[in-house]
């Protein structure tokens, strides 16, 4: 029996022990999907790079310009409203990571045995708290959006369990209130929309819609591009 034959059972035993103790357990990260980019799955750059053990190059403003050995245009990556830069699975593949197709449980394997992670694609959900005047957007257990809002004054925003859509528009205009502009509009219930507005005080001030800021990272645009049609929207 040669040395290679002797090593095989030892290696198999070592791998079994490592798997049992969690040494081989790859990180599982919550993926982020966007209505504006169907078929793409995103993850924060730093989380992906740490799991893949890749170097990340940043400019003086902290923007990523190099991922592994692939150069990027600084500031070209999609971001969360807090500035967290995201990278898609397509871009990870171009940068050198093997990327599987999603399995029946909506999981994608990125990377190799000792350098990689599992990307889980979980359902979206939205929670709007009228008392706190806050909106939160979740992808599984990952909080992807947290922003202040201004809801309808005098209780004009109904509470309940709704769904995003079916109507949405980059620029909608109110059919009830003097053709008022409603950028980044997503319908959630009848004439109630989540949309951007120039004035978003920290108290109810609208005719019933949910106003989101157009500054502060533009959560109105982010929500429009992120939320999928039929995503549950809970208003309480």
Enumerate the predicted regions with their spans.
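Bacterial N-terminal signal peptides that target proteins for export
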Residues: 2-11
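Primary recognition of N-terminal secretory signal peptides and signal-anchoring hydrophobic helices
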Residues: 22-123
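Residue-level detection of beta-strand-connecting loop/turn positions
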Residues: 39, 68-71, 141, 190, ...
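Extracytoplasmic/secreted envelope proteins and their assembly/folding machinery
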Residues: 42-49, 89, 93, 132, ...
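Intrinsically disordered, low-complexity
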Residues: 64, 88-163, 170, 229-236
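Exported/periplasmic cell-wall-interacting domains
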Residues: 157-161, 171-236
């Amino acid at each position: 029996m040669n040395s290679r034959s002797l090593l095989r059972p030892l290696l198999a035993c070592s791998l079994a022990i490592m798997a049992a103790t969690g040494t081989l357990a790859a990180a599982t990260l919550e993926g982020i999907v966007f209505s504006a980019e169907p078929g793409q799955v995103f993850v924060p750059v730093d989380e992906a790079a740490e799991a893949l053990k890749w170097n990340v190059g940043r400019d003086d403003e902290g923007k990523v310009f190099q991922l592994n050995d692939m150069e990027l245009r600084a500031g070209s990556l999609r971001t969360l409203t807090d500035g967290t830069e995201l990278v898609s699975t397509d871009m990870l593949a171009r940068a050198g990571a093997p990327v599987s197709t999603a399995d029946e449980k909506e999981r994608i394997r990125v990377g190799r045995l000792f350098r990689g992670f599992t990307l889980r694609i979980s359902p979206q959900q939205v929670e709007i708290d009228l008392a706190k005047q806050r909106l939160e957007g979740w992808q599984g257990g990952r909080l992807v959006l947290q922003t202040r809002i201004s809801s309808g004054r005098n209780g004009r925003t109904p509470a309940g369990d709704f769904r995003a859509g079916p109507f949405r528009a980059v620029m909608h205009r109110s059919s009830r209130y003097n053709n008022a502009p409603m950028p980044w509009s997503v319908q959630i219930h009848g004439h109630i929309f989540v949309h951007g507005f120039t004035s978003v005080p920290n108290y109810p001030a609208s005719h019933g819609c949910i106003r989101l800021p157009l500054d502060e990272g533009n959560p109105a645009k982010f929500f429009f591009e992120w939320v999928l049609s039929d995503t549950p929207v809970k208003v309480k």
